[in-house]
Amino acid sequence: MVLLAASGFNLLKVNPGLVIWTLVTFSVVVFVLKKFAWDKILHALEERASGIQGDINKAESLRVEAEKSLKEYKDQLFKATEEAHRIVDEAKKDAVALRTKLTEEAHNEVKGIKDSAVREIELAKGRALSEIQNQIVEMSVLIASEILEKQLKKEDYASFVEKEIAKLDKLKIK
């Protein structure tokens, strides 16, 4: 620019012929564009704007759908967690009930075995005492028969001794 100014060419000087031809050329270009391309350009711009608006609307609907899906997922997760807690609690209750039942059954079984053993011991004791009494009766009969030197009938003397032992048992009980 310094060179142009030095050579005497003035850039700031307005040339009226150049201004007119520039305006005429510009007007012709605008007219040609308006006549042949303006509608197509506007139509393309409108299509582009509607496409962008459609994409925005689609993105918004996808966002809403994603939020809805996320909420449903969180609800399902919450329900699944609650169900899992319920199942665990129920399993704990079942385990406690089963433990109580098994403990009670074992206790009852032990009690039954103990009662059975006590009955068997009592029966064995009764048989042993009965056998001892019978032996005592027999020995008493033998001793008494030798002492008296008289042979009594064994059954008579045995019944006599049994009656006497029964009297002694009654006295012991009182």
Curated annotation (Swiss-Prot):
Pfam families: ATP-synt_B. The chain crosses the membrane at residues 15-33. F(1)F(0) ATP synthase produces ATP from ADP in the presence of a proton or sodium gradient. F-type ATPases consist of two structural domains, F(1) containing the extramembraneous catalytic core and F(0) containing the membrane proton channel, linked together by a central stalk and a peripheral stalk. During catalysis, ATP synthesis in the catalytic domain of F(1) is coupled via a rotary mechanism of the central stalk subunits to proton translocation. Component of the F(0) channel, it forms part of the peripheral stalk, linking F(1) to F(0). Keywords: ATP synthesis, Cell inner membrane, Cell membrane, CF(0), Hydrogen ion transport, Ion transport, Membrane, Transmembrane, Transmembrane helix, Transport. NCBIfam families: ATP_synt_b, PRK13460.1. GO terms for cellular component: plasma membrane; proton-transporting ATP synthase complex. It is found in: Cell inner membrane. Coiled coil: none annotated. F-type ATPases have 2 components, F(1) - the catalytic core - and F(0) - the membrane proton channel. F(1) has five subunits: alpha(3), beta(3), gamma(1), delta(1), epsilon(1). F(0) has three main subunits: a(1), b(2) and c(10-14). The alpha and beta chains form an alternating ring which encloses part of the gamma chain. F(1) is attached to F(0) by a central stalk formed by the gamma and epsilon chains, while a peripheral stalk is formed by the delta and b chains. The keyword Ion transport applies. It is a single-pass membrane protein. It comes from the Bacteria. Belongs to the ATPase B chain family. Its main location: membrane. GO terms for molecular function: proton-transporting ATP synthase activity, rotational mechanism; proton-transporting ATPase activity, rotational mechanism. This is ATP synthase subunit b.
